């Protein structure tokens, strides 16, 4: 086999193209390939809980200074809130300028709401108190068996703090956890070999079930959304990255394999373990990566934030529902809260949108039926934007903590293949971060 075809990047790219062709030419057959994509994502999700647990626990235990843990967590939450607010505002502004729903003149009473009933029902059941209580698992084990990211994160933080109080015994327990984590990453390497199959099945199903022709009527919204996500990544995140001392273009090239995996599966979670590995390899301190990345997957959903404001205004425009500036700002305020409630919920984007429309009362909830058919096609842009945003956030916060080896980062982003980063003790003596404990997987 030629060397180029051994690259995961090339294999996934070929799989995506083949999936599109199969779904287009043989729709029924393509729709039947859904288990391939679902199976691959389930294999990845099977590993996410133990990886996040070990990564967060290791990060907190290695910091030892509880004040530093609080400082990093505080910086992360402030960063997430500011950047996601920017994303919400950008979506609002673009939707007002482009008016993707203008001229559709849809009567909400004529829409079939049966397909969206499960989303509106879930939205009505999710209050703020329910969301906060949901973070607390019923048992220590249930968080892992259910794969709830927020619950795993809570247990991991508590466990990490507990180990810092156990002295020598805590170090022994930590060594065992890190050994298990190493084994999990070996399993991840096995699973990643199946990535092209998963991407092929997921893409064939998407095109086979929804088709390309059905997108024509709503194509303007999709194009506007994709363009807005690109604008956000290259302008907003690009400026943030430049301020932090690295190029967004080089960073995207560095994570290109992971981005293709996200594109093929429409799930940013599918590449979460590899993002952790690559950020450590690039010179970010393990303790910062372990705290920021899992938290970002729950609270730093830039792509989802853009989607929420654009979809809300699209429905209002399509149903001829006039929204004053005050009402739009009110929707923005509600979204600042409800967008955080999307964390760890299956179908989170649609449920959060339904919750927002129900809360504000100005926009007909029945309008959700307009975008249900194309929501699956917009999920790729949401997932890609969320993924890049979390990578940038981690590097920015690591640099602010002097936990980033900037020289190593530049060399890695310039395409150099480096050995594992220097040992942690030597890195801490220089005030720099530490990299990966092993070679970067292909």
UniProtKB/Swiss-Prot annotation:
Function: Responsible for the transport of dicarboxylates such as succinate, fumarate, and malate across the membrane.
Family: Belongs to the dicarboxylate/amino acid:cation symporter (DAACS) (TC 2.A.23) family.
Presence of keyword Transcription regulation: no
Gene Ontology MF: a single term: succinate transmembrane transporter activity
Chief subcellular location: membrane
GO biological process terms on file: L-aspartate transmembrane transport
Topology with respect to the bilayer: Multi-pass membrane protein
Database matches in Pfam families: SDF
InterPro entries linked to this entry: C4_dicarb_transport, Na-dicarboxylate_symporter, Na-dicarboxylate_symporter_CS, Na:dicarbo_symporter_sf
Protein name per the record: C4-dicarboxylate transport protein
CC per GO annotation: plasma membrane
Subcellular location(s) per record: Cell membrane
Transmembrane feature ranges: 10-30, 40-60, 77-97, 149-169, 185-205, 221-241, 288-308, 354-374
Source species: Deinococcus geothermalis (strain DSM 11300 / CIP 105573 / AG-3a)
UniProt keyword terms in alphabetical order: Cell membrane, Membrane, Symport, Transmembrane, Transmembrane helix, Transport
Region of interest called Disordered, as start-end residue ranges on this chain: 420-442
